[in-house]
UniProtKB/Swiss-Prot annotation:
Record carries keyword Ribosomal protein: yes
Single GO term (MF): 5S rRNA binding
HAMAP family (UniProt xref): Ribosomal_uL18_B
GO cellular component: cytosolic large ribosomal subunit
NCBIfam families named among the record's database cross-references: L18_bact
Protein name: Large ribosomal subunit protein uL18
Source organism, top-level taxon: Bacteria
One Pfam family per UniProt: Ribosomal_L18p
Quaternary structure and interacting proteins, as annotated: Part of the 50S ribosomal subunit; part of the 5S rRNA/L5/L18/L25 subcomplex. Contacts the 5S and 23S rRNAs.
Role summary: This is one of the proteins that bind and probably mediate the attachment of the 5S RNA into the large ribosomal subunit, where it forms part of the central protuberance.
Family statement: Belongs to the universal ribosomal protein uL18 family.
Length: 120
């Protein structure tokens, strides 16, 4: 019987494999959530570099948020990431949810990033 960690790793690699098939050179918006915070970054897989990143640990957001583990915090991170991506000249990305289902905080971050101007 596979452990929970093995299942999550397998799911994340399956999602990443599908993303690389449809990316067409677009950077990847990778999302990670923990029980206390949420992190997002835009990665150029060709160059292996992070273009823009945002999390609830950023000093800009930390003081204005009640907690880093709710949909309000995820929305703020999505907006901040979209703003930083537009400064870097990024409009089109491919969304990498990792092993997390598209629900709750992950969905809130994605919708806020779309409202901020990212296309995926």
């Amino acid at each position: 019987m596979a452990s929970r960690k093995d299942t999550l790793v397998r799911r994340a690699s399956r999602v990443r494999r599908q993303i690389k098939a449809v990316a067409n050179g677009r950077p990847r918006l990778s999302v990670h959530r923990s029980s206390k915070n949420i992190y997002a970054q835009i990665i150029d897989d060709v160059a292996g570099k992070t273009i823009a990143s945002a999390s609830t640990l950023d000093t800009d957001l930390r003081s204005s948020l009640k907690t880093g583990a709710d949909t309000e915090a995820a929305t703020a991170v999505g907006k901040l990431l979209a703003e930083r991506a537009s400064k870097a000249g990024i409009k089109d990305v491919v969304f990498d949810r990792g092993a997390f289902i598209y629900h709750g905080r992950i969905k809130a971050l994605a919708e806020a990033a779309r409202e901020g101007g990212l296309n995926f």
